[in-house]
Curated annotation (Swiss-Prot):
Pfam families: YcgL. InterPro entries: YcgL-like_sf, YcgL_dom. This is YcgL domain-containing protein Psyc_0800. PROSITE patterns: YCGL. Residues 1-95 form the YcgL domain. SUPFAM superfamilies: YcgL-like.
Length: 107
């Protein structure tokens, strides 16, 4: 299974894998590959940036996620969301809380 991987400027360390089951026969026309994402979810992501194209059949393992889980989600829904590690999410939440608190008390 081939897929494209995108990241989003609003969400550090979150990557979305988009299935490309017909690759390379699907390159004749320009297509909105992110169109498989639910509209509300996609709207909250902000601007996307293409990271890379990946052939999962020739990739032995993935760094942060289970390859079989990625393949299953790509086959069933057409995309897979790789969330940041818990420590990154915790740091982002703490930073956001501090910034919110600072804006309340420094006005």
């Amino acid at each position: 299974m081939h897929c494209d991987i995108y990241k989003f400027l609003k969400h550090d360390d979150m990557y979305i894998y988009i299935a490309r089951p017909d690759y390379p026969n699907d390159t004749d026309e320009i297509k909105d590959w992110l169109g498989v994402l639910p509209k509300d979810f996609r709207a909250g992501l902000g601007r996307s940036k293409f990271v890379m194209h990946l052939d999962l059949a020739t990739t032995p393992a993935l760094a942060r996620v289970d390859k079989e889980e990625v393949l299953a989600k790509l086959a069933s829904q057409g995309y897979f969301v790789q969330l940041p590690p818990q420590d990154v999410m915790r740091r982002q939440a703490e930073l956001h809380a501090r910034e919110s608190q600072d804006s309340i008390y420094n006005t």
